[in-house]
């Protein structure tokens, strides 16, 4: 049970590392000051999530994935690409990311061992914040991403999660 909790929390920790890269990449390169402010605000909440996952991994004597630097760089690059396309789908990218993250968090909560109340509590708190981020993007004018981008994001995240679960 501890091993399963450790693996799932490692995946969620990686997700928060990616969130830092994604939102920092977007914030650094967007020209829209309103969006930039929102992105940096979201970054602060994501940093809290990262700290929560990090602390829980420590309690479980768990390891972080060795791929975190790669995932961060890839996410930062995606953030830059999204920022460069701000007129067409930057906010949609945020909304879709948070939608997929919320689904993943719900799955993680259900997969955790029944008695791992602490990890479940952390992920439930994070899920509430992620839904708030999704709503914020929608409220400030996000546009739905093309299905090809949404599907690519989903496939890429599944690959990353599978690798991170084990390494």
Residue ranges and their predicted role:
Residues 1-167:
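Non-heme di-metal
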């Amino acid at each position: 049970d501890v091993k399963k909790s450790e693996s799932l929390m490692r995946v969620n920790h990686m997700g928060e590392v990616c969130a830092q890269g994604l939102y920092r990449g977007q914030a650094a390169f967007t020209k829209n000051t309103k969006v930039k402010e929102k992105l940096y605000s979201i970054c602060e909440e994501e940093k809290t999530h990262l700290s929560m996952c990090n602390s829980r991994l420590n309690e479980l004597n768990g390891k972080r994935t060795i791929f975190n630097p790669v995932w961060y760089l890839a996410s930062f690059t995606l953030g830059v690409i999204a920022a460069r396309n701000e007129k067409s789908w930057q906010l949609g990218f945020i909304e879709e990311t948070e939608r997929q993250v919320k689904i993943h968090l719900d799955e993680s909560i259900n997969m955790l061992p029944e008695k791992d109340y602490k990890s479940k509590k952390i992920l439930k708190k994070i899920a509430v914040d992620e839904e708030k981020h999704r709503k914020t993007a929608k409220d400030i004018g996000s546009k739905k991403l093309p299905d090809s981008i949404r599907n690519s994001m989903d496939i890429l995240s599944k690959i990353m999660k599978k690798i991170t679960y084990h390494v």
